[in-house]
A protein has these predicted regions:
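Asp-based phosphoryl-transfer active-site loop
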Residues: 461-478, 657
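Short beta-strand scaffold positions
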Residues: 122, 144, 192-193, 371, ...
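Structural alpha-helical scaffold elements that stabilize or flank donor/cofactor-binding regions
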Residues: 113, 183-184, 339, 460, ...
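Receiver (REC) domain switch/active-site residues of two-component response regulators
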Residues: 188-189, 522, 661
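Catalytic cores of nucleotide-sugar-dependent glycosyltransferases that transfer UDP/GDP/TDP-activated
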Residues: 1-360, 364-448
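Active-site phosphate-binding/coordination module
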Residues: 482-573
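Mg2+-dependent phosphoryl-transfer enzymes with acidic/Ser/Thr/Gly-rich catalytic loops
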Residues: 620, 627-705
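Conserved acidic, metal-coordinating active-site core of Asp-based
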Residues: 558-659
Length: 705
């Protein structure tokens, strides 16, 4: 049986034809790469099937193509679209609250397949987060490509003058970096485009190990990107440029990218505007995606265009600068060739460039390069010898590089020929796919798999629906009348089982539960998720213990956190567990949790920290949590998550209410859960204790389904 490979590409507008590159900040070169990689892999004889999972979008503002649940790409490759969060299109920074729901959907999709993937390849931080969760739950190796890394972006934005607060507000950079750390901790293989990316950018992450990385430079589609002009294509490009340029036959300085801050296009316009020599020799051509009404653009795009328009006006560049409003994706190769025919230069002024696929495309079409001296372009220029690098943060240096690049026609021809030959030799798609498969097969076959993981149900579910009750808060002081009503309602529905959620150990939880006189529970999720048990007698689940114990070093956790005393004090032995280390805080200080997480990352411990009731902190194995225990249970029972109602109340319980299960927040809840009030699958009870549980059961009609 051949390989089944599953790729995760969650944000942007992704389809198999007519990619809307540059339409917004999320639909860029990464989109092209993932599509071409999927097609290239599917064409290999050892690969049977390739699925690219993305988000299903139902939004009148975008094409109905993105609402198609299944799109064949040919040759065994497919796009699979799964719903996640609101139906409307969302930029990637707004997707974070819904990624647990996507992880649930991907897990269910894989569990329903006759064959599970040989590996999951996650692209970018959001998919890395989802991929890490699915990999943990199903025991499938994870391959990760960050494409653009949060720590590097944060560094560049800080250098550009933005504050930490501004960066966080615009880019949700903290969640992105945390997601990248989590993906790196789980990955069997990290695909990078260059040595610099591995040695300098990924190396800033605590969870990254150098031996995880393999440098596999992307390839170029030689069928599209080549130096030979196709009949009629030049006139099409001229029609795009004609409204803007007085002397359209001048040598162009061309850039093709998205209108986002990182691409640094205003700096290129200013360098051009400051140089009479550049204006005499060249036109400036900016292909920045397709745009319609500026009022409908995202703020970042709108700001970039505003800066460009102001610079054109300030330097009086009318007739010298082209910025076409619309173009078709299939015109991009023709635009490169049109520029090459006029002895043009392709310019990449980006502040940071993990690789630079457009540099390869331009070179394949015979266009020399002037590029940022950051990341991938260094490797490309070293291999291709077809242009020069420049410090794009220094306008004088950028201006000088552009002036020198167009000064010598013989050198231009040498650069052109070098680029065409080097791309053919070093950057073919066949070579990329062969190298990719070799690295992934070797790393993923050696990846440590759990001794036992659930992919299909191992037993028939004992119930059709499951109510999970918080034992520590929701029923702590329940009135007898409310408990009696709840008891009667639950006993009347044999298809609905109950389970207990608690930070206590089994002995303590059993004593507390006995006081409630409720029907016996089918399941116990205890010690904050580190202990999973079944039935009234509390039979331990050995598969869960095996799953979470991998890589767990309880003694090392205690040693690492000793340095935080007296901020943290170990709780008494009766509150500890084999897979749970519990502390009490000296004071409920906001920064302690992040301090603990940072220490665990720095020491590369496979552990996670949670704060409860503002005073208590638990450290568990990386794979252990109440939310993960619920999903392990549902996979084993074959119970759909939307048939599970989770009652939550405590600080740190937000993760219980993410994803596909139904959520009920008790009236006595911690204020940190108020952020979930707009979630469609989260109901906030207004009545106390057992009455609130009954209120939630009625809201969802949970006992009458």
């Amino acid at each position: 049986m051949g390989y089944y490979l599953l790729h995760l590409h969650l944000h942007g507008l992704f389809r198999g034809h007519g990619l809307e590159l540059g339409r917004d900040a999320d639909t860029g070169g990464q989109t092209t790469y993932v599509l071409e990689l999927a097609k290239g892999l599917a064409a290999r004889p050892e690969v049977d099937r390739v699925d690219v999972v993305t988000r299903l979008i139902q939004d009148k503002r975008v094409s109905p193509d993105y609402a198609q649940a299944h799109e064949p790409l040919g040759g065994g490759a497919n796009i699979v679209r799964l719903p996640c969060g609101p139906r409307r299109y969302l930029r990637k920074e707004l997707l974070w609250p819904y990624l647990d729901e996507m992880a649930d959907a991907v897990t269910a999709h894989i569990a329903a397949q006759p064959q599970r993937p040989n590996w999951i390849h996650a692209h970018y931080a959001d998919a890395g987060y989802v991929g890490a969760l699915v990999s943990q739950r199903l025991g499938i190796p994870l391959v990760f490509t960050g494409h653009s890394l949060g720590r590097e972006k944060q560094r560049r934005l800080l250098e550009g003058g933005l504050t930490h607060e501004q960066i966080e507000q615009t880019y949700a950079i903290g969640r992105r970096i945390d997601a990248e750390e989590r993906a790196l901790a789980q990955s069997a293989l990290v695909i990078t485009s260059t040595q610099q990316e591995a040695q300098q950018q990924y190396a800033r992450y605590n969870r990254f190990e150098a031996e995880q990385a393999a440098v596999v430079p992307p390839g170029v589609d030689a069928q599209r990107f080549h130096p030979v002009a196709m009949p009629g294509e030049a006139s099409d490009v001229e029609a795009l440029m004609e409204p803007f340029l007085r002397e359209p036959n001048k040598s162009p300085l061309l850039t093709i990218c998205r209108a986002v801050r990182r691409k640094n296009v205003p700096a290129l316009v200013e360098a051009y505007g400051r140089s009479a020599l550049l204006q005499e020799r060249h036109n400036l051509v900016l292909v920045l995606g397709c745009r319609e009404d500026p009022r409908s653009m995202e703020k970042q795009q709108r700001d970039q265009f505003q800066q460009i328009f102001e610079l054109v006006d300030r330097f009086d560049l009318y007739g010298k600068v082209a910025y076409p409003k619309q173009h078709r994706g299939e015109q991009i190769p023709a635009i490169y060739r049109w520029a090459a025919q006029r002895c043009g230069i392709f310019v990449n002024p980006a502040l940071t460039e993990p690789f630079g696929l457009t540099l390869l495309e331009a070179a394949a079409c015979g266009l020399p390069l002037v590029s940022t001296d950051d990341g991938g372009p260094r490797d490309i220029l070293q291999r291709c010898s077809n242009g020069q690098l420049a410090d794009v943060t220094d306008l004088d240096v950028l201006q000088q590089a552009l002036e020198e690049a167009g000064a010598d026609l013989e050198r231009w021809r040498r650069w052109r020929d070098n680029g065409i030959e080097a791309i053919s030799r070093n950057y073919s798609w066949d070579a990329h796919v062969c190298s990719y498969l070799g690295e992934a097969e070797r790393r993923c076959s050696a990846w440590r798999r759990p001794e036992r993981t659930a992919v299909a149900p191992v037993q028939a579910p004992p119930v059709q629906r499951l109510l999970l009750l918080d034992l520590d808060v929701c029923l702590q002081s329940a009135q007898p009348a409310g408990l009696e009503d709840l008891r009667r309602r639950l006993a009347a529905d044999p298809n609905c089982g109950i389970g207990m959620l608690s930070g206590r150990n089994f002995a303590s939880a059993r004593l507390r539960f006995a006081e409630l006189h409720l029907p016996e529970p089918q399941v116990w999720i205890l010690e904050a998720g580190a202990d999973l048990r079944f039935g009234p007698e509390g039979r331990p689940d050995p598969s869960w213990q095996q799953h979470i114990a991998q890589g767990w070093q309880r003694q090392k956790v205690e040693q690492v956190l000793e340095g935080l005393s007296p901020r943290l004090t170990l709780q008494p032995a009766m509150n500890q567990g084999s897979c749970k280390v519990s502390y009490t805080l000296e004071a409920p200080t906001a920064g302690v949790l992040e301090m603990v997480r940072q220490r665990l990352r720095q020491h590369r411990l496979e552990a996670r920290a949670h704060l409860f009731h503002h005073w208590f902190l638990d450290v568990l194995p990386m794979r252990a949590s109440k939310a993960d225990a619920i999903r392990h249970l549902c996979l084993n029972w074959g119970l759909p998550l939307d048939q599970v109602l989770v009652v939550a109340a405590q600080q740190g319980d937000a993760e219980l209410l993410n994803g596909s299960s139904l959520g009920l927040v008790a009236a006595e809840h911690d204020h940190s859960l108020d952020q979930l009030r707009r979630r469609p699958k989260v109901f906030f009870a207004s009545r106390p204790q057992a009455w609130g549980v009954l209120e939630g059961l009625d809201h969802y009609r949970f006992l009458t389904r």
